[in-house]
Amino acid sequence: MDLQSTYDRIATHFSETREYAWPEVESFLADRQGDRGLDVGCGNGRHTELLAEHASQAVGVDLSRALLDEATSRARERGFAATAAFVHGDAAALPLRTGTMDLAVYVATLHHLSPRAARIESLNELARVLRPEGVGLVSAWSTAHDRFDRTEGFDTTVDWTLPGGETVPRYYHIYAPEEFEADLAESDLVVVDTEVSSGNCYAVVRAERNHGG
């Protein structure tokens, strides 16, 4: 199941259903400012738009070129194109220089990566691009979500239904909260805080090197 082609197929309809930033992201950014902000797995740019209000320059990275087109259109239509750039790239191999980001948002994307090594490598990449004083927010779907009746992490597919009725399967790794914390602990990130909210695991993180690691 190819992640890029999956989201290229559903990009237009997906974007139509993703208008507003998540409240957890709004809370994370509320009292923070920086020169550069990063949105990993930016989709249609809804969180990049919010980052652009808290950083002088926001960068959105996504594997789907069709979603990047949606994000570019959103930025132009909503007036934040001058302070946002959208780049094609993989969360596990970010096309960005080391130590350049003050703020980062990596939400609703980690759970699409497979296998586990790719998920951890993406966390390492987030650590790599954060500046020494940088801070990020990571989220993933969790077993705490109402739709799941499991306590241990597992792989699954969740169908996306297009307007004509066609279904497109999407890969997910559903994290148990303890497993989410374990993967973060194995990465080059340091966890500042964690919580489970609206069926998602969240972590506020910094780069390990900032703490002498």
Where on the chain are the PLM-derived regions?
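Short conserved loop adjoining the S-adenosyl-L-methionine
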Residues: 93-98
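Class I (Rossmann-like) S-adenosyl-L-methionine-dependent methyltransferase catalytic domain
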Residues: 1-33, 44-92, 135-213
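A conserved beta-strand element that flanks and buttresses the S-adenosyl-L-methionine
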Residues: 105
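Conserved S-adenosyl-L-methionine
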Residues: 41
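A short glycine-rich, Lys/Arg-flanked "PGG" loop and its adjoining helix->strand segment in the class I
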Residues: 120-132
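Short catalytic micro-motifs in class I SAM-dependent methyltransferases
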Residues: 108-112, 140
